[in-house]
């Protein structure tokens, strides 16, 4: 559908999306099948046009605090699965408080509090709620929580104490693939937890993996599945094999690239937040993701931080170019800039 379009046709296509045009499954198949660089650049062009209509050259910045890498789950793709014999950490309350002090006035729009499904917090969930309240009191910024499949009562308490956003990724809506990835975890339970959070006034984020055994049809199923959540943020991440996991040696020559899917997400979810994560390729990767239609930079770490990300391409590097100053400098070089905080809170509506 995009292959033979000239620039004026691409502009019209972007306008159709802005006016409310919904892509059919056949449209998605055509877009997911694009391969040549010329075709993909056309797709990215339309995605940027749609994004710029709603957000201009302004970008949002999300600080990532992975405060516990302990987890009770056995996700086949995840470095932190409970069977992997790795060094782990759990920040103390005081360490988290000190991290917050270092973040004051840095320019972040939102703080993402992320953990594995750590039994320390799952057995005493009020500990988690108290952390949310402390970070909210320290920084006064919107808070995203990424704690896994928390019980409804704890989600309600966290909401009351200042949490605004709830992130819980389905990874795939292909149930057969899901069972291989999230071993022993309920597909419906995960979906219903996210729906409950939405009903209680949270903004929600959903996400999928690519390059992990998904084909075009399962990717369409996932895109449609995310749509059914009415999400506020949608993401896709490339699967990166992790040492010590069941999928450590998994290799796939997939043409379903993260950048392609980011652009398609922008056409399906024109007003949504779509992340450009630093977790896989750092700031250079951020540039490519923004050029594909993303509008929020995630996995920014506090300056000089030794905290983990999720996939950590830079785990063994001495210098980790993932602080907010480095991000802003590169944004300025792209002709982009951080949005005012008030604009982010208008986008949130939660």
Swiss-Prot record:
Phenotype of gene-disrupted mutants: Cells lacking this gene are unable to translate UAG as pyrrolysine, and do not produce pyrrolysine.
InterPro entries with a match to the protein in the record: Aldolase_TIM (IPR013785), Elp3/MiaA/NifB-like_rSAM (IPR006638), HydE/PylB-like (IPR034422), Pyrrolys_PylB (IPR023891), rSAM (IPR007197)
Enzyme class (EC, first level): isomerase
Pathway recorded for this protein: Amino-acid biosynthesis; L-pyrrolysine biosynthesis
Signal sequence, renumbered to the chain: none
Catalyses which reaction(s): L-lysine = (3R)-3-methyl-D-ornithine
Enzyme Commission identifier(s): 5.4.99.58
Cofactor binding note from Swiss-Prot or TrEMBL: Binds 1 [4Fe-4S] cluster. The cluster is coordinated with 3 cysteines and an exchangeable S-adenosyl-L-methionine. Binds 1 S-adenosyl-L-methionine per subunit.
Residue ranges of every copy of the Radical SAM core domain listed in the record: 57-279
PANTHER family with a match to the protein in the record: 3-METHYLORNITHINE SYNTHASE, BIOTIN SYNTHASE
Identification of the protein by name: 3-methylornithine synthase
Organism: Methanosarcina acetivorans (strain ATCC 35395 / DSM 2834 / JCM 12185 / C2A)
């Amino acid at each position: 559908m995009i292959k033979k379009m000239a620039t004026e046709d691409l502009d019209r296509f972007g306008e159709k999306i802005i006016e409310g045009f919904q892509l059919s499954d056949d449209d998605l198949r055509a877009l997911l099948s694009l391969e040549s660089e010329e075709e993909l650049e056309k797709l990215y062009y339309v995605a940027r046009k749609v994004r710029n209509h709603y957000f201009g050259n302004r970008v949002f910045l999300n600080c990532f605090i992975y405060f516990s890498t302990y987890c009770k789950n056995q996700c086949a793709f995840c470095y932190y699965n409970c069977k992997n014999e790795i060094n782990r950490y759990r920040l103390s309350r005081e360490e988290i408080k000190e991290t917050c002090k270092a973040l004051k006035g840095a320019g972040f729009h939102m703080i993402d509090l992320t953990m594995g499904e750590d039994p320390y917090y799952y057995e005493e969930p009020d500990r988690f709620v108290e952390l949310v309240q402390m970070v909210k009191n320290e920084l006064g910024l919107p808070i995203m929580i990424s704690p896994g499949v928390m019980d409804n009562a704890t989600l309600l308490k966290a909401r009351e104490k200042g949490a605004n956003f709830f992130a819980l990724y389905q990874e795939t809506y292909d149930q057969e693939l899901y069972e291989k990835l999230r071993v022993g975890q309920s597909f419906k339970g995960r979906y219903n937890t996210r729906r409950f959070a939405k009903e209680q006034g949270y903004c929600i984020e959903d996400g999928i993996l690519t390059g992990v055994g998904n084909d075009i049809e399962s990717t369409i199923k996932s895109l449609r599945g995310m749509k059914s959540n009415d999400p506020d943020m949608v993401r896709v991440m490339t699967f990166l094999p992790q040492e010590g996991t069941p999928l450590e040696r998994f290799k796939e020559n997939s043409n379903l690239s993260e950048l392609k899917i980011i652009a398609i997400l922008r056409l399906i979810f024109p007003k949504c937040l779509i992340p450009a994560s630093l977790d896989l390729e750092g700031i250079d990767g951020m540039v490519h993701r923004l050029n594909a239609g993303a509008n929020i930079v995630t996995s920014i770490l506090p300056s000089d931080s030794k905290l983990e990300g999720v996939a950590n391409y830079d785990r063994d590097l001495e210098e980790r170019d993932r602080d907010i100053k480095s991000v802003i400098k590169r944004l300025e070089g792209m002709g982009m800039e951080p949005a005012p905080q008030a604009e982010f809170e208008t986008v949130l509506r939660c």
